Amino acid sequence: MIKQTKDFAEEVQVLAALLQALDGAAWSEPTQFKQWTPDQILRHLHCWNEAADWAVHAPPAFQARLEAGRAHARRGLSMRDFEQVVVNCNGAALLERWATFALGMAHRWQLLDPRQRVKWAGPTMSVRSSLTARQMETWAHGQAIFDMRGRDRPESARLLNIVVLGVNTFGWSHQVRGWDTPAHLPHLVLTGPMGEMWTFGEVGVSGVVRGLATDFAQVVTQTRHLLDTTLQVEGEVARRWMLNAQCFAGLAETPPQPGQRHKALRGA
């Protein structure tokens, strides 16, 4: 069984537990992530979970979804509009549709070859990478809803997948901005949610990043600015990376400003 299937399912269940407590009005409340609402976030996740699953099990459906999205964009319409068209529900019904499909997807992918190549919007990806990307999307977009509700997310060792994705996109974070990639990854010394020590990179070559793995994951997914974390960063290469990290595909995105994304000071 691919370990990432269990981790993806757990990520879905953690977010679903939070969403089950939302009332009708909260589903249309803007979050700190580009003012997206929980409805918009869940439509986005479900739309592209379907696409990822179809890329493996129904390639013609995947290609049709991709081409429809591109045609929508060529007409000058937003992806949020497109996602609302193809995922035409909201609130509790949307939660049920998203969670049921995502958990079913995790089950369907258990026995796949993790090295199998599958199509995506850009270059092909391995099954393992595709599933990790879906977990990362769930975790990163879910952060906006946890922040909106003033809650801390229960983390676990599943976070390592997102940390590794952040490490593996060190080069991408530079390339997407047209910068040369430094020859060496900074040394990372990260503390996992259960006190684990996760280390990457060579000592004494390109600086160092020390701190909580959760903070590192928030920086590479752009859910927090570096200054809103407790990460300790030494060296020019390490600091430039942490100020511009981007572990997801697409065009270069500007990370949030200091203080822009944070946990709301409220309960419920």
PLM regions: where:
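Short, contiguous alpha-helical
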Residues: 29-72, 120-176, 216
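Short, helix-capping/interhelical loops that line the mouth of catalytic, cofactor-
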Residues: 1-3, 50-111
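Glycine/small-residue-rich hydrophobic helix-like segments
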Residues: 177-220
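An N-terminal domain-cap segment
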Residues: 1-43, 52
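C-terminal interaction segments
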Residues: 204-268
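Acidic interhelical loop/turn segments
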Residues: 20-31, 102-131
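Hydrophobic packing residues in well-ordered alpha-helices of helical domains and bundles
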Residues: 5-8, 95-98, 131-134
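Amphipathic, well-ordered alpha-helical segments in soluble domains
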Residues: 11-18, 48, 101-104, 108-111, ...
